[in-house]
């Protein structure tokens, strides 16, 4: 049985790029770019959403240790509200690729569109479950963002951020209507915007 993606698919100097956090009502959108080293296999790479939290945490450390190059980047809430979530995500992906210590010959982007990059790039739909470097990027981005949301839960208690990570769950929406938005809530997202509109009236 093949555990995770086949590491033989890893190509020289190909960066995988992915994002986490497009859907949440609060917090940054986090991206990562990873160039894997074909001579240093990492077993069990897969789409971060298909892995347990413990497995993601272990792989997070292994990827950072064994990858040829990696970079975690972000776009802040203010940028999301100013640019819109799609453009903010593209900006964060651009930052991740530009932050790599090794220039890739190709960047493979999870999804159906590419940011503007100085290197050739191609989109790969469902890339996080097909391309090992994109799977690695998805793990770095998710673990990094999840850890940050746990920290933000301590700063803004009562919203349950450590659990839902900012996504619009029933618990989050109820807390939002009861407590109002925090400075890290995305004012351009409908549930937050509607609350602010009501409070202005």
Swiss-Prot record:
Gene Ontology molecular-function annotations: manganese ion binding; RNA binding; RNA-DNA hybrid ribonuclease activity
UniProt keyword terms in alphabetical order: Cytoplasm, Endonuclease, Hydrolase, Manganese, Metal-binding, Nuclease
Single GO cellular component term: ribonuclease H2 complex
GO BP terms: DNA replication, removal of RNA primer; mismatch repair
Domain called RNase H type-2: residue spans: 12-201
Record-linked SUPFAM superfamilies: Ribonuclease H-like
Cellular location(s): Cytoplasm
Coiled-coil annotated spans: none
Cofactor, free-text remark: Manganese or magnesium. Binds 1 divalent metal ion per monomer in the absence of substrate. May bind a second metal ion after substrate binding.
Major subcellular site: cytoplasm
UniProt superkingdom: Bacteria
UniProt EC number: 3.1.26.4
Catalytic reaction(s) noted: Endonucleolytic cleavage to 5'-phosphomonoester
Essential cofactor(s): Mn(2+); Mg(2+)
Binding residues for a divalent metal cation: 18-19, 110
Enzyme class of the recorded protein, top EC level: hydrolase
Physiological role: Endonuclease that specifically degrades the RNA of RNA-DNA hybrids.
PANTHER family: RIBONUCLEASE H2 SUBUNIT A, RIBONUCLEASE HII
Family statement drawn from the similarity comment of this UniProt entry: Belongs to the RNase HII family.
HAMAP family the UniProt entry points to: RNase_HII_B
Protein name: Ribonuclease HII
